[in-house]
Amino acid sequence: MASQGTKRSYEQMETDGERQNATEIRASVGKMIDGIGRFYIQMCTELKLSDYEGRLIQNSLTIERMVLSAFDERRNRYLEEHPSAGKDPKKTGGPIYKRVDGKWMRELVLYDKEEIRRIWRQANNGDDATRGLTHMMIWHSNLNDTTYQRTRALVRTGMDPRMCSLMQGSTLPRRSGAAGAAVKGVGTMVMELIRMIKRGINDRNFWRGENGRKTRIAYERMCNILKGKFQTAAQRAMMDQVRESRNPGNAEYEDLIFLARSALILRGSVAHKSCLPACVYGPAVASGYDFEKEGYSLVGIDPFKLLQNSQVYSLIRPNENPAHKSQLVWMACNSAAFEDLRLLSFIRGTKVFPRGKLSTRGVQIASNENMDTMESSTLELRSRYWAIRTRSGGNTNQQRASAGQISVQPAFSVQKNLPFDKSTIMAAFTGNTEGRTSDMRAEIIRMMEGAKPEEVSFRGRGVFELSDEKATNPIVPSFDMSNEGSYFFGDNAEEYDN
């Protein structure tokens, strides 16, 4: 497995990486959550939101987006240098929903970015608190991962749309730092690299001059991030080759596509963090809970406990099923878009359906949607059990998967066989040995052929009762192997468009 010793834990990435013990890490993650909560409370006061309106997930998303936009230095600079009609580069805002005379009304608010930054810093003891901002970015990314299937983006870069289990974090902004890089899937990194290579092929000056030098450094850094996700020597050696290329072109492109495919069986290590909407942290802080004092972890029982005691509401369109809307948000809160549905159903305690079977659109409401017919309902975000999140990719084995998705990327460390459609995946490799790295390719293909669908990953790991905070009694679930394992099955999911 990956050399765990040299890698920093997510919490260290989350906390600027000084080696800390568990208690310090928990306190420092708790401090970040406190800051988000305090900011949210203050914004609800500014916007004069009632308790119910403050717990509306759509309002939470608008407030989160406002602060992310206020701190987006590069975009702010760009907007000031390229003024566009009707856009004030110094202001940020969005739709806020209020209940007026028994109806939901949309109100567009506009704030000075400077004012939002002031409120954010004040909530974070005068700090910029970039980690809190990244945390919100990852929550938005997890929500996108559960809502949209990135078929078009995959096809545009020449990847198979069925490889969606590799696309975690594909909508994360570039500025999301180490914590953001940790949650990006192999496919996401491959896609970012391919975009660079394609630009280099089309634009002779892309790698040249002072700008080209910066581009080159970014390219090598992305290669190293991707290399660090792979867990076999052959995959890593291929990444070295891609990184060291003098002039990245078609050969590197082919190698990256090959590596992405190989990751369906020889899975990369991708972090999973439970990032919740600000409207969960706000009320908890308001009720007097001190996250810094109590400590908090994004990968253990804490998010489960928090969701167990939270009330979150959502606007519901006329033909949407509130239970399905709840499942969408539940999966996002648990960063589980690419986990096996059999396990998710077990943890949640109610059946979790593939995306195409859900009668619900995304959580955000477009500005042209009619508010007259909008209802609201409680999101059911509680779980029956809790489980420890994993970063390992759970490699040993595999099993049958579905037409819409041919592999999984586990989110929880629980004993199971990981479904994947070996014949479909291997078919992509037959006769494709041209290229310069045939020995590494042969080695990777050999390992993939050796992977057995029946083998079990995370042996002996189980889920836990919510009362079992110290994780002493693992319950190992047994699964019906005949059941569908993947979420983007068949594919009725909408596309994610920026």
Swiss-Prot record:
Matching SUPFAM superfamilies: flu NP-like
Sequence motif: Bipartite nuclear localization signal, positions: 198-216
Entry PTM: Late in virus-infected cells, may be cleaved from a 56-kDa protein to a 53-kDa protein by a cellular caspase. This cleavage might be a marker for the onset of apoptosis in infected cells or have a specific function in virus host interaction.
GO molecular function, one term: structural molecule activity
UniProt entry tagged with the keyword Nucleus: no
Comp. bias intervals (Basic and acidic residues): 8-21
Annotated region (Disordered), positions in chain: 1-21
GO cellular component, one term: helical viral capsid
Motif Unconventional nuclear localization signal location, chain numbering: 1-18
InterPro entries: Flu_NP
Location of the protein in the cell: Virion; Host nucleus
GO-annotated biological processes: symbiont entry into host cell; viral penetration into host nucleus
Keywords on record: Capsid protein, Helical capsid protein, Host nucleus, Host-virus interaction, Ribonucleoprotein, RNA-binding, Viral nucleoprotein, Viral penetration into host nucleus, Virion, Virus entry into host cell
Biological role: Encapsidates the negative strand viral RNA, protecting it from nucleases. The encapsidated genomic RNA is termed the ribonucleoprotein (RNP) and serves as template for transcription and replication. The RNP needs to be localized in the host nucleus to start an infectious cycle, but is too large to diffuse through the nuclear pore complex. NP comprises at least 2 nuclear localization signals that are responsible for the active RNP import into the nucleus through cellular importin alpha/beta pathway.
Similarity section: Belongs to the influenza viruses nucleoprotein family.
Subunit structure: Homomultimerizes to form the nucleocapsid. May bind host exportin-1/XPO1. Binds to viral genomic RNA. Protein-RNA contacts are mediated by a combination of electrostatic interactions between positively charged residues and the phosphate backbone and planar interactions between aromatic side chains and bases.
Protein name: Nucleoprotein
Species name: Influenza A virus (strain A/Memphis/4/1973 H3N2)
Organism classification: Viruses, Riboviria, Orthornavirae, Negarnaviricota, Polyploviricotina
